[in-house]
From Swiss-Prot:
Organism superkingdom: Bacteria
Main subcellular localisation: cytoplasm
InterPro entries: aa-tRNA-synth_I_CS, Anticodon_Met, Met-tRNA-synth_bsu_C, Met-tRNA_ligase_1, Met-tRNA_synth, Methionyl/Leucyl_tRNA_Synth, MetRS_core, MetRS_Zn
The name this protein goes by in its record: Methionine--tRNA ligase
Organism from which the protein derives: Shewanella loihica (strain ATCC BAA-1088 / PV-4)
Membrane spanning stretches: none
Length: 673
C-alpha cells in the first residue's frame, strides 16, 4: 500500500509527426507506460502526458511532397500514432499536438519572459542557404563530415558517431539534404537563448541526482567544452510558431517541442476541473515531474529545457530518464533485412503484450541498448507467459468450475502466499527505480515456485480419489490465489491480460488487495488467456517489413511514367528556336487557376507568355531568373491576352514543376542548341 499519495506528471518524448511509429519508438512508450501504470496501481495521482511533435522543416517539406497542407498531414499522422499507441495498450491521460493554441501561448509566454529577463540575444549570423531551393537550411538538412571525428554523412547539429555538437557551418564538405546542392553562406538576423548564463544552476541540478550517472558524466564533458548560446530562430518558409516580436522569424522546433509537455497538460487541465496547471508547473510546485527520453536527445532535455524553465520562472523536472536504442538480432534495425519493423506491422501479426513483456524483461535503469532477438523473444514469451504464468491457471481453474461449483476454498497452509507477499516491496522498488528486468525475474521465480507446487501436488491425480477432494480443492484454490498475486504484480506490464484475468476471477486486481482472503469467492469458467508465439508470425512480420522496403526501393522511373515520344528528324528539331530569356516581370492572371503572365526579356525584345506554372511558383520567386523559352512558336490568342511563346519546365505537374534555368554566364537572347 502506498504510504502517502504522490502527485506525479510523467512524459515520453514527443513522436515526430512525419511518419509511422516503429518498434524502436515503442521501447520508450512501453517503458513509460509501465512506470505510470505502476504508480496508479500503487494509488498515486499520476498523469501520463504526450503529444505529437508537429513543427519543423521536415514536416513542411513532407507535406509539400504529398501536396497537402501541413495541418492536414499532421492531423492524419496523429490519428495513426494514437491508434498504434492505443493498440499497444499505451494509456495516455492526454495526447495532444505541439501545433495547438495551448502550446502557442506557452511558447510565447516563455520566450517573452526570457527576453524580458535579458536571456535572449540578437545577432546577425551567416547561415547556410540552399541556392536551388531558395531557403535557409536547418541543421538537420545539412549533411557532411563531422569536424571532430571525421565520420561521414553526419547531420549539421550533432554527430551520431562521437556525440559531438557543432554548427552546420563547421561540417566538412557540407551538402543540402534537400537538393544535394552545395550550400552558400547568407546573412540573417537570429535570436539566441543565453544558455551560458545558467551554467552554475545546471551544474548544481546535475549534481542533485536528477540525472542518471551516464547522463551526468556526459554533461560534465559538455561543461568542460563550454556552453554556447543556442539559436532558437528559423527563417521563413517554416512550419511553426512565429516569434511574437519578429515577423518572418519562427521558433526553432526544439524550443516549442518540450513546451509541448506543458501544452498537453494545459489541454488536459482545460478538460478537467479537478486539475490545476500551476500545482504541477509553478516554481514552488511540490508535485513530481519526470521525463522519459531516448539517449539521442539528452542535450536538449538536460541543458536547454531546464535552463528555459528556470529563466521563465517555472519549476524544473525532478528527473530525466534516458534509455538506449533498440537493435534487432544484434544489429541496427534494417529495412533490407526486414528488421525495421513498424508498430502496425507487428500489431497485424502478434499480441502487443508479448513485446511489452519482452521489453520489460530486458529494461534496466541504465542507458543501455536493448536487443530484440526474435528467436529469444519467441522462446521467452512461450516459456514465461504461456508455459509458467497462464499455465498455472489453465491447469487448475477447470477443476474449481467443474467439481467445486466455481468457488475457492480457504487454504489451510498460507506459507506460499506469505512467500509471494513478502516479495511485494522488492518488486515495487524495482518498478519505481525502472529496474523492470529485475522485477520480471523476481516474478518469474515466484511463478516457478507456484508451478513446482502444482506439479508436486498433482491435483489431476487427487481429484480421482474420493478422499482427496478437499485436498484437490485447496491445491487448486491456492494455485489460483498465487496466480492472482502474480498477475497483479504484472498488471503494469500486461494490462490486457490483467483485464481478462479480472473478468475470469471476477474481482479487481489491486496492490492494496494482494493479501485478500478469497475463501468462498466464485470465479467464472476459465477461457484461454494467451497463445504461443509461432515462428511463422515472426517470419510474416519480417517478410512484410522487407516487402515494404522493396516497394519503396523500386518505384516507377520517370521514363516508366512518361515514355519517350516517337523519333523526330534533326530537321524537325532545328525548326525550334530555343532562347535564353530573363523573366522581367511575373504576375497573377485574374480568374486563371493555373496561369502566370510572364514578360520575357530576350536581350532587346520582350515577349509575353502565359505559363501554366502557378501551382509551383509565386510571381515574386520568378522575377529576375533566367529560363529557356521557345521563341518562334506562333502567337496564340487567349482570353487573357496574346501568348507569344512557351517557357520550358520539367515535372509531373502541380507543385512538382521546375522551370529550366541555365548556368551562370548565359545571357538573354542566346540560342540554345
Amino acid at each position: 500500500m502506498a504510504t502517502s499519495q504522490r502527485k506525479i506528471l510523467v512524459t515520453s518524448a514527443l513522436p515526430y509527426a512525419n511518419g509511422p511509429i516503429h518498434l524502436g519508438h515503442m521501447l520508450e512508450y512501453i517503458q513509460t507506460d509501465i512506470w505510470a501504470r505502476f504508480q496508479k496501481l500503487r494509488g498515486h495521482e499520476c498523469h501520463y502526458i504526450c503529444a505529437d511533435d508537429a513543427h519543423g522543416t521536415p514536416i513542411m517539406l513532407k507535406a509539400q511532397q504529398l501536396s497537402m497542407a501541413p495541418e492536414e498531414m499532421i492531423a492524419q499522422v496523429q490519428k495513426e500514432h494514437q491508434q498504434d499507441f492505443a493498440d499497444f495498450n499505451i494509456q495516455f491521460d492526454n495526447f495532444h499536438s505541439t501545433h495547438s493554441d495551448e502550446n502557442r501561448e506557452l511558447a510565447s509566454e516563455i520566450y517573452l519572459k526570457l527576453r524580458d529577463g535579458g536571456y535572449i540575444k540578437s545577432k546577425t549570423i551567416s547561415q547556410l542557404f540552399d541556392p536551388e531551393k531558395s531557403m535557409f537550411l536547418p541543421d538537420r538538412f545539412v549533411k557532411g563530415t563531422c569536424p571532430k571525428c571525421k565520420s561521414v554523412d553526419q547531420y549539421g547539429d550533432n554527430c551520431d558517431s562521437c556525440g559531438a555538437t557543432y554548427s552546420p557551418t563547421d561540417l566538412i564538405d557540407p551538402k543540402s539534404a534537400v537538393s544535394g546542392a552545395t550550400p552558400v553562406m547568407k546573412e540573417t538576423e537570429h535570436f539566441f537563448f543565453d544558455l551560458p548564463a545558467f551554467e552554475d544552476m545546471l551544474k548544481e541540478w546535475t549534481r542533485s541526482g536528477s540525472l542518471q550517472q551516464e547522463m551526468a558524466n556526459k554533461l560534465g564533458e559538455w561543461f568542460e567544452q563550454g556552453l554556447q548560446q543556442w539559436d532558437i530562430t528559423r527563417d521563413a518558409p517554416y512550419f511553426g510558431f512565429e516569434i511574437p516580436d519578429a515577423p518572418g522569424k519562427f521558433f526553432y522546433v526544439w524550443l516549442d517541442a518540450p513546451i509541448g509537455y506543458m501544452g498537453s497538460f494545459k489541454n488536459l487541465c482545460n478538460k478537467r476541473s479537478d486539475l490545476n496547471f500551476d500545482e504541477f508547473w509553478a516554481k514552488d510546485s511540490t508535485a513530481e515531474v519526470y521525463h522519459f527520453i531516448g539517449k539521442d536527445i539528452v542535450y536538449f532535455h538536460s541543458l536547454f529545457w531546464p535552463a528555459m524553465l528556470e529563466g521563465a520562472g517555472f519549476r524544473k523536472p525532478n528527473s530525466v530518464y534516458a534509455h538506449g536504442y533498440v537493435t534487432v538480432n544484434g544489429a541496427k534495425m534494417s529495412k533490407s533485412k526486414g528488421t525495421f519493423i513498424k508498430a502496425r506491422t507487428y500489431l497485424d501479426n502478434l499480441n502487443p503484450e508479448y513485446l511489452r513483456y519482452y521489453y520489460a524483461a530486458k529494461l534496466s535503469s541504465r542507458i543501455d541498448d536493448l536487443d530484440l532477438n526474435l528467436e529469444d523473444f519467441a522462446q521467452r514469451v512461450n516459456s514465461d507467459l504461456v508455459g509458467k504464468l497462464v499455465n498455472l491457471a489453465s491447469r487448475t481453474a477447470g477443476f474449481i468450475s467443474k467439481r467445486f461449483d466455481g468457488k475457492l476454498a480457504k487454504v489451510a497452509d498460507a506459507s506460499l502466499t506469505e512467500t509471494f507477499l513478502a516479495k511485494a516491496d522488492a518488486i515495487a522498488e524495482f518498478y519505481e527505480t525502472r529496474e523492470f528486468g529485475k522485477a520480471m525475474r523476481e516474478i518469474m521465480a515466484l511463478a516457478d515456485i507456484a508451478n513446482a507446487f502444482v506439479a508436486d501436488a498433482a491435483p489431476w491425480q487427487l481429484v480421482k480419489e474420493e478422499d482427496k477432494q478437499e485436498e484437490a480443492h485447496q491445491v487448486c484454490s491456492n494455485a489460483l490465489n498465487l496466480f492472482r498475486i502474480l498477475v497483479t504484480y504484472l498488471k503494469p506490464v500486461l494490462p490486457k491480460l490483467a483485464q481478462d484475468v479480472e473478468a475470469f476471477l471476477q474481482l479487481e486486481l489491486t496492490w492494496d488487495d494482494l493479501a485478500k482472503d478469497l475463501s468462498g469467492h466464485e470465479i467464472a469458467p476459465f477461457k484461454a488467456l494467451m497463445q504461443r508465439v509461432e515462428m511463422k508470425n515472426i517470419e510474416a512480420i519480417i517478410e512484410a517489413s522487407t516487402e515494404n522496403l522493396q516497394v519503396a526501393e523500386a518505384p516507377k522511373s520517370q521514363l516508366d511514367l512518361d515514355p519517350i515520344s516517337e523519333e523526330i528528324s534533326f530537321d524537325d528539331f532545328a525548326k525550334l528556336d530555343l532562347r535564353i530569356a530573363r523573366i522581367a516581370k511575373a504576375e497573377h492572371v485574374p480568374d486563371a487557376n493555373k496561369l502566370l503572365k510572364l514578360q520575357l526579356d530576350l536581350g532587346g525584345e520582350t515577349k509575353q507568355v502565359f505559363a501554366g506554372i502557378k501551382s509551383a511558383y509565386a510571381p515574386e520567386d520568378l522575377e529576375g531568373k533566367l529560363t529557356v523559352m521557345v521563341a518562334n512558336l506562333a502567337p496564340r490568342k487567349m482570353r487573357f491576352g496574346m501568348s507569344e511563346g512557351m517557357v520550358l519546365a520539367a515535372g509531373p505537374g502541380k507543385k512538382d514543376l521546375w522551370i529550366l534555368e541555365p548556368h551562370e554566364g548565359a545571357q538573354p537572347g542566346m540560342r540554345v542548341k
